[in-house]
Amino acid sequence: MASQISMVAAEYQVRAITGDEFIVIYTRGSATVKACLARFLRMFNSSTDEWVVGLDVEYTTVLESKKLLKEAEKKKPAMIQVCVHNVCLVYHICHADIECQDFKNFIKDERVKFVTVDFRNDRDVLGRIGLVVGQPFDLQKTSLVSSS
């Protein structure tokens, strides 16, 4: 049996407690990321609504004091979750097969508003691997979500 890290992609149908159904796509593969981004673009292009995406980032664990660490040893993105409507891409980026330029282009696209909570740390961590979010909308910074 292959380890879960070696698994390139899987798609799941998930029903929330509210009865809403979601499609969750888990991957570390750039081909799956590209296909999911194309799906998002088709969704955007078939709608007159603003292009809005939910964004969350999980990091690798750092056990030592950050002050003592070299840049290469600091926290890095482990998983990036990107959601449009009822489709969520869970990109295990720390185990990505190759760098996905399409993903870099997507998250820096100024047409897309990326909704986040407490984006300050996410911005720093994403920047460590050259990812820049073009139009973040931080719910906490705009006081739409409490900081406590």
Q: Model segments located where?
A:
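N-terminal accessory regions of nucleic-acid-interacting proteins
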Residues: 1-53, 57, 61, 96, ...
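Short, basic, glycine/proline-bearing loop/turn elements
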Residues: 17-28, 82-92, 140
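Hydrophobic "anchor" residues on beta-strands that sit immediately upstream
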Residues: 52, 88, 113
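Nucleic-acid-processing active sites and adjacent nucleic-acid-binding tracks
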Residues: 87-104, 108
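Short, well-ordered alpha-helical microsegments
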Residues: 61-62, 99-100, 122-124
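A short alpha/beta connector and helix-capping loop motif
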Residues: 63-87
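Short His-Asn-centered micro-motif
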Residues: 55-57, 91-94, 115-119
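Metal-dependent phosphoesterase core characteristic of DEDDh/y 3'-5' exonuclease domains
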Residues: 81-85, 106, 112, 119-148
